[in-house]
Every structure is written in structure tokens, then in C-alpha cells.
Amino acid sequence: MALNKLLSLTFQLLLFLLSVSSESPWIAEDTSQIQTKLLEFAKSPEVFDWMVKIRRKIHENPELGYEELETSKLIRSELELIGIKYRYPVAITGVIGYIGTGEPPFVALRADMDALPIQEGVEWEHKSKIAGKMHACGHDGHVTMLLGAAKILHEHRHHLQGTVVLIFQPAEEGLSGAKKMREEGALKNVEAIFGIHLSARIPFGKAASRAGSFLAGAGVFEAVITGKGGHAAIPQHTIDPVVAASSIVLSLQQLVSRETDPLDSKVVTVSKVNGGNAFNVIPDSITIGGTLRAFTGFTQLQQRVKEVITKQAAVHRCNASVNLTPNGREPMPPTVNNKDLYKQFKKVVRDLLGQEAFVEAAPVMGSEDFSYFAETIPGHFSLLGMQDETNGYASSHSPLYRINEDVLPYGAAIHASMAVQYLKEKASKGSVSGFHEEL
């Protein structure tokens, strides 16, 4: 009797092991072998040519924040052709795709879709067809890499130990599209999120990141300094807002040089000054505006900017009104990378591209609204290099900006590898059972 019971238990155990082996071969397979397969798939001529075609189509038809209707339509069309379910609309033009079991764990990959109000200065076959609009920050490449990852992951969907959520986000450039997507449930059930940004300052085939604070928090300000205009030859009969504005610009610089710990990076930049239209007339008012960047003490820095502007204006007998959210542009928190996800990213990059491919990044004073995702759940943001020795690449937000299309398979493979590795590690530790999300 005992022998029969033992044989029955042994048989059940063998059936379970065979089930795990047949359904989840990646659990036992070497990580580097898995990632090599993903990269090889991404670099295959068929997939690479497909990605280049998509990227160029998006580049030719740039759309600003919350206007990405055609970009979103293209994304949905490609997801349908691949066979991926999606949710639309999210945050007006956003799209969220789902690959895998529909059950936990859920891990997200994110790409931004919007272009910039810049006239493209690069003359080539696929130059922007829309006057005054251009993909000058690589978002066309970001969308393409995430679609590439979608194709890779769908090809291997039966091996996924959970669900990959594909977030195609609108309005990264100053309009906080990530925050709106978050408010509309983009992170529902998601346990971790990854994002990649192309960089012309990092060598091709390398990727950079750091644990903890990576990108600064950011905000903008606009102030109107009002005095009393008049003839420039008789300034004693005026209250000159130009002199007041000049004093304000200089005084704002002291917030960093004299009020900030030298070991704590902050930036206050006045980047626009408008006022007056004649050589011999002192204007009634001057408008100034700029940006603030900080990793810590951001609210205090905002308050000091407001105080300096209003009180320096008063010294010069002027009035000043300060707007810290002009055109609805809300401050963004700093982007802070989760330490465990950073370690995972570092390992994935080295396994995928070689030991020398990972670059330890310094903190960057640039900002990203990916931070809204990363302050809600564990997140990791990274930079993927596209610089090479033969071609110079302009920095982002330049009319001469262009991307190295050879980097597209690398970004797609890193995206896919991060998702696979995250789900694999969660599966090895055990995950929630008895849950099913209707996609």
C-alpha cells in the first residue's frame, strides 16, 4: 500500500517537472543564451528592415504632445499585425499593449511618442514633412525599439512567465504625459517599469545607467516685470523694467552659487527675455522665463526664485508676477532608479553586449517624465549609445539631430531581455497564483 502511494507521488512529481520543462524552457536555460537569441532575432534582416521602415515613417510625420493621432494609429496597426491585444485611448493618444499570460507578475516597458516644435535642418530622403515640427529627441526611435521588443516578445510569448505591458506614452516634452497615463491606470497591477533613451554622447553598442538619483527634477518659471515706459532720453520720468529684469537675472544665479551646497547640483537658467520694440523707448514691461533643475530641495528652490524676482523688482520700484506653471507645465520629480532593477539592467547589458558594454553614468541635470512612473513603482531608466567614430551626431533638441538606425535592434533586444529576465527571476522566486487579468 505504502509502495503504491510512493509510486503515485513520484509519478505526479515527474508530470509536474515535465510540465514546467515544456511550458517554461527559459527558466532552466542560461540567461546569456536567451538574450543572444533575442538579439539575433532583432538583428535579422527582416526585423531590422521592418524597424527602419517604421522609424522613418514616424520621423516624416512628427506630432506634438497629445496630438500623436497618426503615430498612435501606426502603433495600433503594427500591434494588430503582430497579434498583440491593446488598450486605447489612454491619456488621449496613448496605447497600452499586453503580451504573455495575462497573469502576474506584470512588468512594463515604456516609449514616448511626441515630437518637438523645431524645424528640421537635416536634408535627407525622410526629412520631416511637417513644417516647424521634428523628432529631435529620438522618440521615433524609442517607439520603434518598443515595437521591435513587442515583435520579439510575441514570437516567444509561450515562454513568458507573466505579462509584459507595453506603454506608448504621449506628451513627454513638458506636458507630463506620464502623469496623465498613470492617472488613467497605465500602471494597474504593474510591479516594475523600464525605459530607454537614445544618447549621442555614449558610444555605439554601450548602455549607461546608475542606481539612485539619475535625472534631475525640473520645473519652469515665467515672470512679468512691470514698470512705467517712456522715452529713453529721459529715463528719470520712467520706471525702467529692463534694469529691474537685468538685476533679477544676475540675482537668480546666486541661488546656486551662494545658497546651494557645492556638492548638491542645482541649475537656475533664464533662457528667454522679451520686451520692447524700439531703440529709443523704455517698455512698460519685460517678460523673463527659464528652467529650474534639482535633485533635492526643489520646492524650496521654487520659492526662492519667486522671492528673488518679486523683491528685486520692488527694489527697482517695479511690480512682478511669477508663474511657476506657465502653459500648464507642472514640475517633474527627479528620476530615481531602483537599485535591484539597476543591478538587473547591468547584468543584462553585459550578457547581451559584452562586459565592456555597460557604462556607469554620472547624474544628469536633464529631466524625464518617466519619473512619474518610477516614483509610483520600482523603475529603471537608461541611456543607449549611438555615437560612432565616423559620424558625428548632434545633441537632442537640435535641428540637426538624427539617430543611428543601427542601434534599433539593440534597444529592442534590451527591452525584451529586461522583461524576460524580470519575469524569469520572479518565477524562480514564486509568484501570485489564482489571479487573472482580463486584457
Swiss-Prot record:
Motif stretch (Prevents secretion from ER): 436-439
Cofactor list: Mn(2+)
Keywords for the protein's UniProt record, in alphabetical order: Endoplasmic reticulum, Hydrolase, Manganese, Metal-binding, Signal
Keyword Magnesium tagged: no
Binding site for Mn(2+) 2: 137, 139, 197
GO BP annotation list: auxin metabolic process
Family matches, as Gene3D superfamilies: 3.30.70.360, Zn peptidases
Signal peptide: 1-21
GO cellular component: endoplasmic reticulum; endoplasmic reticulum lumen
Residues reported to bind Mn(2+) 1: 137, 173, 397
Pfam families: M20_dimer, Peptidase_M20
Chief subcellular location: endoplasmic reticulum
pH-activity relationship: Optimum pH is 8.0.
Disruption phenotype: No effect on the sensitivity to the inhibition of root elongation caused by IAA-Leu or IAA-Ala.
Enzyme Commission number(s) from the entry: 3.5.1.-
Reported tissue expression: Expressed in leaves, stems, siliques, seeds and flowers. Detected in the distal tips of cotyledons and seedling leaves, hydathodes of leaves from mature plants, pollen, ovules and developing seeds.
Cofactor binding summary note: The Mn(2+) ion enhances activity.
EC class (word): hydrolase
Localization: Endoplasmic reticulum lumen
MF term (GO), any: IAA-Ala conjugate hydrolase activity
Function: Hydrolyzes certain amino acid conjugates of the plant growth regulator indole-3-acetic acid (IAA), including IAA-Ala, IAA-Leu, IAA-Met, IAA-Phe, IAA-Ser, IAA-Thr, IAA-Tyr and IAA-Val. Is the most efficient enzyme of the ILL family for IAA-Ala. Not important for IAA-Leu hydrolysis in roots. May act with ILR1 to provide free IAA to germinating seedlings.
Family the UniProt entry places it in: Belongs to the peptidase M20 family.
PANTHER family linked: IAA-AMINO ACID HYDROLASE ILR1-LIKE 1-RELATED, PEPTIDASE M20 FAMILY MEMBER
Subunit structure: Monomer.
Protein name per the record: IAA-amino acid hydrolase ILR1-like 2
Encoding gene, per UniProt annotation: ILL2
